[in-house]
Amino acid sequence: MVREIEKQQGAAFKLKKGQRLKVIDPRGEQVSDMVLFNAHDTREKISSGKTLDFEETILITKGHFLWSNRSNKMMEILEDTNGRNDFLLAPCSPETFKIMYNNSGYHPSCFENLHTNLKSFGIEPDDIPTAFNIFMNVQFKEDGKLSVDPPLSKAGDYVLLEAQMDLIVGLTACSAEDSNNGSFKPIHYEILG
């Protein structure tokens, strides 16, 4: 059954070892932030540093694993029809919009959506790690300068992942304008198996 995360919203759910998660961009150019926690000990969580280190690339896609802070495999990426994801940048937060966009008012954020949906699992704001940003198109120049460009994902693109342990998953439809080419759209997901 395909479920929808409305624009600028989030969801959290459990995934059993061996189950598959399909994250779908139904309209194109929409990022989805994903965080993972060990369902039996939430101190173990997805780690950008360990993943980039062990996979020896900053371009995480089909054939790669997402690793935990305890050096355990959490998910394997089985399929990725877009091929461009980010694992460098933190989930957008209220502070992101104040510091980077000079936004003085309230703005929805992935960080808030992750925390709001994960708090029923006992996960606190300080527990939220760097997210695996599905469909996010971060470019980097030779001098190290980063830029967030419009996603390359088209309507119907998806990433299929398989759980390597029992997981708690946090997932969003990203709230940052620059990450989504200036518009906000839903994200679909499906749990298989």
At which residue positions do the language-model features occur?
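Acidic, Ser/Thr/Pro
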Residues: 1-193
